[in-house]
């Protein structure tokens, strides 16, 4: 067999899936420009790595009987620079993707990547055959206030493929043409949430249909987190969706403090759009937030289980205090126990995960990624599902080192 026919691999020991499916959706976790031995083919070359990562998404999805044409969302964790801005990355992705309308593209600027010489990793969600079925899109020119980019590519800001809906994540600078950095974090959050709701309404849904909220913000303390959290939460009635919000480098280019996107599901019954009821699990042991929020920890619908971001918070409480403060591996093990707790009421366990997303604090003097991956492998029964690893400089506070969420087969 020639090297061209060999499936790529992450540069980790042990067995892992490059793609997997839960009900109607298929997932690729963290595709990079890897060869079959886990080596980066184009070290430190963002453009070539992006092309290679897209090719690897297509190769991975082939085992699930789908391809790039079936992708509904690509999420790019990318190291930006003065030479390469967010608009440039979107343009490169649009050029690498074969069909129109394009899938939703969400960008997350990051300082670090999990593996040496890596500049980008791509997470992808696909729904087989959606282009041949009823679908609906919202498109607009991509303009980011204060970002000096030539041209304005047309992007998909919301895509509804049957019951599944993806929205592009966004900042206040995406939503307000005259944005100049003058809004505080809570005000930026209100602008973003209003824009997301408008995008969802354009395809027949609303924020209440969300199955997953994913957000990022600048901050290192609970005092910085709280006003943004309350602003986002004000757009949901209880029960809200599972949520994950991470302190993350956003890039200085657009002077923003937060970025949010959602995934949603809504059914079409006869001629009406209808909310899809969820099954819910929240065992008493599983922590609650130190602010009163409407989000849930685990919801099942259409044979998929969506998890909220799990953290090593004190069990049986809403204190916000952390177990094993500052210790990555003990906190990772403890956090995975919450994922087990949440899947158990549905008759599932971590081996049923089809996507695993892990944000973790990575310190320069501590090369813990390899040990973390081994721990996650053990917790998932010896075979990792498609995995997105995102190292960050800090988590919610100095005691926190990790947040993990995923999607499981229901």
Region annotations inferred by a language model:
Residues 1-72, 78-354, 360-410:
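N-terminal presequence-like segments and the immediate start of the first folded domain
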